[in-house]
Structure formats: structure tokens, C-alpha cells
Amino acid sequence: MVTYKLNNEIISEHDFCLKCRQTPISGKNYYQCAMSFDIETTSYRNNHGEKRGTMYIWQFAFSYDNDIYYIYGRTWKEWEYVIRVLRYQFELGKKKLIIYVHNLGFEFQWIYTHMYMTKIFARKPRHPIYIESNGLIFRCSYFLSNYSLRNLARERGYTSKEELDYSIKRLWCTPLTDEEISYCLVDVKIIVEYIKDEIKKNGTIEDIPLTSTGYARRYCLEYISSHENIQSYQAKIRDILPDTPELFNLMNEAYTGAFTHANRNHTGIVEENVYCKDYTSSYPAVMTRKRFPYRFRKADPTKLSTYILRGKAVLMKITFYGINAKSNHSILSLHKCATENPKVDNGRIISADELTTNITDLDYDIINKFYSIKRKPKVHILYVADYRYLPKNLIMSILELYKMKTTLKDVIGKEEPYLRAKELINSVYGMSVTNPLNDEIMFNYGEWDTIPTDTTEGLEKYRKGRKIFTAYQWGVWVTAWARWELLNTVYRIGNDVIYCDTDSIKCLNEHKEIFDSENERIMKENKEVMEYYDIDEEFFNPKTIENKVKTLGLWDTEPMYRYFKTLGAKRYCFSYEDDYFIKKQSKLGTDYNFFITVAGLSKESGKNSLIKQSLKYNVSPFDLFDFENTNISNNYCMEVPPEDSGKSAFSYHSTAFKELAVDYLGNKCTVEESSFVHAEPIAFSLSIAEQYKLLLKTVRVDIATGGICSNKNTKLRKVGDKNWAKRS
């Protein structure tokens, strides 16, 4: 039975339909209401061990004035009936009704067999951004917000998200308590609250962008348009865009993301008194003060040194011979290089007989700092361009956001503009590095296909874009400059650096003089931009509510770690205090002063599991946080069990099934799905590549025998020397 509710009261279908007819519509025939959709599902294996998934409740939320209407049911036939009701009441066809779904890709796998799709738009398979079905449009609210539902509710102050016990096997025939139904309705209520705010902010629902970076693009374009002639600005941008497939492909292959790596000589060791430095707003900082390449031209590959000395921006395809890391830091990524006989450090190259890669002049500078090269490299392709600052109004659009984010933080009554500035400045990077040439993603009868775009046609379309205001090479250089800033500082500190990630460094010893000199250089560069473009100092040096100057792009000092241990990129744990194993009260509640960051594992799940196991084995969680630990057992390795990991393995199925099933209460009913997703909780373990494992064993033997030392000021402890950070 389909149920209709107004807030918490059950109403008739007739009363709901009356409200549908009263919904305002824009001149472009879009209904101006916030509407959301969600389903709850159960996964199980049948008696033959086959994977199954079934929907046991679906729900819509619909906002009218200050009221929220809900519709929910238990079967797909009921859902199809409601879709027909919506089509009829809203007279869909030329008129459009937008319904938001958080993580549309999941719901899409269930609903595509229950309705005819007229259009599907996706950037990659299984991740539709929106789908259309004769006037009914489903959009993904996750792509728009870039938040999980729980974080969206917390950040925006919406209704708090509650969790059902998903381990319970529920079917469409399972009686649901009022509390369980309430949990289901909260999810769609959060999205309706969010979309109501977005409609208010944008004016109409059709003006809401598809993704979070769409807001950043719109903001920057509007800012530029309000300060200069946009046609003249865009003409200058079009003049410098890559105009040949060779140049574009060279740029695309030279693009590299953030640098994250652990010093192999510190990997697996509990370090004490670790200093933490953060490079504030890394990407906006380099965009506002660094110079970027403008129009590229092809150049003589034998003249690389000449162009470097002239201070030109350079793109190149280059081969290095006999390349070998000078220190414990390996910076070149194996997957970005073609190599012969490489020695690898967790995906980073220590040495190679021959190495071919596509890089910028900034990468070339860093490579020469961190590697020795046996003989002169061979440059195969070379393009050069002049370095200039980004256009003033593009810089100012970013600085305005930084100023707002800094000055409005914690100001009572300014929470909304602060959050908007924060979200926009966080999207500036994504906006700048978006690849303008996208493959076409097709969906046919349950199968996703990728059709590569024609580069020549794509570049022509890119050049003619009405909303163009950045050049693709600028995005390539944004990450190149950010890596250069990070690695240049790492190079100066040396082997005291334990770990670095994008815009942060964890190191032994304070190295105050190095960070101070880096900050002096950065402030000098900021001043040069201010003088060049006549920019007021307050934009680079805004003040917080406490009247403290917060200069853009400086290295800031974060609280010191009392203990820190890394097992490689995106794998580390730490505590701020000696007595981390004693629960203490903080603003976040009562908890242990022990924290964990592991890619693919929730911080809360990983921490709770380690604490639980440390109590079981009566050892420190720092000891448990390892690939293997023979002190506990000969085959122990850190593993978070399925019930604690919060991770699931998802499989997508397009084969229909119909079978008898039994729920957790013993109720039997026939379940039927034409397409579905099966999700199964899985354990999480700290795996390690055999090559990396052998490397670490070699390093540890060298440390234990005194063969390797970080530098003249640092003596690494011998492995097993002392039981650091043990529970007392």
C-alpha cells in the first residue's frame, strides 16, 4: 500500500495531488519544488549461495511552502504506480520535474528496468550525474554537494541522519516499526532541506549546477564578467588553448596529482615528537601568486637547457638514463613512466636504467634535485611558453573567497556565507583541472560502454565553449606548482621528513629556519603580485575574528604528535599525548587520544577496531598497526573484521530473479527483482606488495646494523630496540 504523509500525519492521495497541481512552475517549464527519492535494500545469499539484493522500502519527499510531504511504499509495482501519478498530476513531458537522489548510481541500477530512459549523462560508467524519462529528471545530489549524507546534514545544520541496522534481513513483507520508517524518511528529508536552500540560492531549480565545481565555474565567470568585457577576456583565452592533439596529449600526460609518500627509512617505526606543518590553501595560493604558461609553441628538443635558463614554461617528453635517488625520498611515480629495470619504493621509483616520461619544467627541476642521472637525458618532444600571472580578475575572484572564508569563520550570523566561500574555494582546484575532453559514456541494456572522444573535434568544441575562462595548461601547472612547493621544502629538510601528503609535512626536529625562509619567500612573491596588479594587502593577508593575520599560502605549525607511525602513503596513526590509551573528555566527546588515517577505511572504524584488538592482546595499538607482528603471533597482521570495517563489496546484476525468501523474523514471501545491487561487508587488511615488503626488510636490516642514518642530526632507532608507546 502506498502511504502519503504531510509532515507526520497520514493524508489521502487526493490531498497530495491537490498540492502537486498548486506547485509553481518557471518560464522554462521546471517545477519549483524540492523533491528527493531513496530506497532501502537488503543483500543476502540464497540457499544456492547466489548473490541477491532486494528493495524493501522506497520513499519520496516533496516540499511545498514550509511543509514536507512524504510518499513511501514497499514494492516496485507501487513505485511504478506513483511514477504514473506524478506524470499525470504534474503533466510531465514538456513540463519537467527534478528529483534528487544521493548517489544516483546506486538507485539507477534498481530503477532502470522499471522506467524508460530518454537520456543518461555520466562522466564514467556506473556514475550517472542525471537521467531523464519523459519530463521526469533524476539528478545526483552527491555530485552537487560533494558530501556524504551524514556530513551534508552536519555541515548545513539539517536534520541529523540516523542509521538502520543493515545487517538485518528485511523484505517487502517485513513489518517496519515507526522508528524504522522514520529513519528511512530522514534521508529524503535531508536532501529536500538541502535542495530548498539551493533553489533559494540560485533563484530557480533549473539554475542549480550539476556538480559542486559548477558553482566555482559560475562564480569565477560572473566575477570576471562584472569587472571586464567577457568577450574580450574569452578571446584572449581561446588564443592560448592547446590547438593540436600532440600538444593536448602531452599536457594531459604531464598532469600529475598531489604527491603523497612515506620515507622508507621511517616506515613501520613509531617516531616520537613529530612536527606537523601545513601549507595553507595550497592550490588557491599557487593560483594567485605563481606564474603560468600562456601560448605554447613547438621548439627544438636540443635546446632544453637554453629555454630553462630563459625562464620559459616547458612541456617535454624526455628519457633519463641511469637515474638513481640521492636520498630516502623517491618522487617519480611508476605508473607515469616507462622504465627499464626499475627499483621501486611503494609505487615510487628509486632507480632505473632507463626512464621515459612527460613532465613540466617544474618537474624537471625537482627530478634533478632528488635524483642523480648517469648521462645526458634525451628530449623527444619540446613545447615552450612564456610565464605570466593569471588574469587579474581570475586571481581576484579567488582572493575574494579566501578573504571571506578567513574573516567570516566563527562569526555569528555569517555561517551561510562562510560555508559558501569555503565550499567554493575548495572547488577552485577541481574547476581548474577538469579535462575539457570527455569520453562519451553509453548505457545499453544494463551494460556501460565508453566511447573515446576524437581529440581534434573535442579541441574545436572546447575552443568554441561559451563559458570558457581558463586554459587547460593552467590546471596542469596548478598541481605542478603545488608539488614543487612541497617537494622543494622536503628537499631542504632532507631525511628528517617522515611523511608528506599534498600540502603537509611530518618531520623530526622543528627546522624552524627552513620554514621561516620558505615563508619569507612566499610573502615576497605575494607582495610582487600585489604590486604588479595593484591588489590591496588585505586580500592576501585577511584577519580572523580574533584579529590575527592569516596570510595565504604560508607554512603553518599544527600541534605536535607525541607518537607517529606510517606504513606508507595514506597509512598512518598518531597520538598527541603519552597517555593516549586513557579515555579523556574533549569537545568531540569522551574517547582515546589515538587516531588513524588509512585510505579506504573510515577513521572511526579503523580506530575502534585497533583499540578493541589492543585491549584483547594487551599491546599498544601502535604495535597492532603493522603489516605483520610476530610478537603477537607468527601470522598476525592488522585486519579489521567485516562487522567493524564499514566496507562493502558491491556487485551489479542485470539478471532478473524471482524466489521465496525468509526475513529475520521468519516471514516468508516471494521477492522479485529485474536488476539489483548486492552489497556484502568485507574485512579490511593492510596488504603490502611483496616488492615493498622486501625493500622495507632490507632497510630495517640496514638501520639495525647502523648502515643507514637519516642525516647527521638524526639517529633512527634500531628495530626492536625498545617497546615504544606500550600500554601500561
Please state what every model-predicted region is.
Residues 2-99, 110-130, 245-270, 279, ...:
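Conserved RNase H-like, two-metal-ion catalytic cores of nucleic-acid enzymes
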Residues 37, 139, 269-283, 421-428:
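Conserved catalytic palm subdomain of right-hand nucleotidyl-transferase polymerases, strongest
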Residues 67-171, 175, 182-186, 190:
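Conserved DEDDh/DEDDy metal-dependent 3′-5′ exonuclease domain
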Residues 151-234, 486:
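Acidic, Mg2+-coordinating catalytic module of metal-dependent nucleases/exonucleases
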